Amino acid sequence: MQITETLAEGLKREYTITVPASDLEARVNTKLEEARPEVEMKGFRKGKVPMALLKKQFGPKVMGEAMQESVDEAMQGHLDESGDRPALQPEVKMTNEDWKEGDDIVVSMAYEKLPEIPDVDYKAIKLEKLVVTPGDDEVKEALDNLAENAESFATKKGKAADGDQVVFDFVGTVDGEAFEGGSAEDFPLKLGSGQFIPGFEEQLVGVKAKDEKDVEVSFPEDYQAEHLAGKAAVFACTIKEVKKPVPAEVDDELAKKFGAEDLEALKGQISERLGTEYKGAARAVMKRSLLDQLDDVVSFELPPSLVEAEAKQIAHQLWHEENPEVEGHDHPEIETTEEHTSLAARRVKLGLLLAELGQKNDVTVSDAEMTQAIMTQARQYPGQERAFFEFIQQNQQAQQQVRAPLFEDKVVDFIGEMAEVSEKEVSKDDLKAAVDALDEE
């Protein structure tokens, strides 16, 4: 068996693999000899079938297996010896397409190898950890929001104002024809909530019980029901009742509605929850800073195939975010831009770097951590938790999608422990501004 290098350009590698016909024949004979004891053929005792008949009966099938095994062994032997790690599955093609039994096998193998990742001086990385301590104002704001969400409504005499609730019947028509989903009875609508299409709720401000009013609106051009998008509609409304909001009192009774023993216990729960939220947000800000610094200080060649594949995935994802009504791949070819490629290069670079750092430092994701993450995701599908859990267990790709962010976060935490980290007390608004800035970059 002979392997000859034909291209070594950057990370690109190409080789010619030659498997001599004699090696192939020997492998075929060995496989047939191993199988002969179990072969039964009319006219011969079990295990006594002549080799010539075995070759005639099973030769083509065994030859195919022998060819595949020979090439696979040659490839693996080369990778083990060279230490190359292909970025993607190597492309293997048989070059002598007119091959016949008795000829050598000649195949070409091409791949891009993963680059050598340089070491990182963790101590040279300087990070700032934003610290926000939940204060009385933040707890009060959260309590007020809970009270607003727990508000009730009481019958009101007179005209409806913004923030009031109107209970009404309505029938919607387009071009004089009622449409499916365009009518309801005793529907409660809080004016100003934005629950209905733009322009609807504003026209109910000022109505009284027993009033009848035609509300004229136009459906948005991007309305989810395509047959209504952009159409003018008239809703005939009959007002049943007008109600004013009655805010819930911030007291022990409110606390009990939200599962706390009393108001002080609820305040403690809110403070703890806010603290957890602030820490999570601060961690996201610090993680971005860490990744930015790694991107700046570490440099190595990237496999073009990985960057291209990532750019296509980014372009595809962004296109679907802009066109949510289109499902699957039933759409025109999506072109990648320089912006897509630039973002892809950063993702590939940081992905390879974090993977290498994690491997070198024995960072792993435990079974318990995987189970916890899967259970957390499963709760997003009430009533289908078991089915979701079983799907993940049986799907290697889905498991990897769960494991990858866990692994990345653990590597980031490892680097964070080695880096120089300073704490900075900031306000909630400062933290929010820092988080908002992440989306703008």
Curated annotation (Swiss-Prot):
This is Trigger factor. Keywords: Cell cycle, Cell division, Chaperone, Cytoplasm, Isomerase, Rotamase. GO terms for molecular function: peptidyl-prolyl cis-trans isomerase activity. It comes from the Bacteria. Residues 163-248 form the PPIase FKBP-type domain. It is an enzyme of class 5 (isomerase). The keyword Mitochondrion does not apply. GO terms for biological process: cell division; protein folding; protein transport. Belongs to the FKBP-type PPIase family. Tig subfamily. One of its GO terms (cellular component) is cytoplasm. InterPro entries: PPIase_dom_sf, PPIase_FKBP_dom, Trig_fac, Trigger_fac_C, Trigger_fac_C_sf, Trigger_fac_ribosome-bd_bac, Trigger_fac_ribosome-bd_sf, Trigger_fact/SurA_dom_sf. Consists of 3 domains; the N-terminus binds the ribosome, the middle domain has PPIase activity, while the C-terminus has intrinsic chaperone activity on its own. It is found in: Cytoplasm. Its EC number is 5.2.1.8. It catalyses: [protein]-peptidylproline (omega=180) = [protein]-peptidylproline (omega=0). Its main location: cytoplasm. Transmembrane segments: none annotated. The gene is tig. The keyword Zinc-finger does not apply. The lineage of its organism: Bacteria, Pseudomonadati, Pseudomonadota, Alphaproteobacteria, Rhodobacterales. Involved in protein export. Acts as a chaperone by maintaining the newly synthesized protein in an open conformation. Functions as a peptidyl-prolyl cis-trans isomerase.
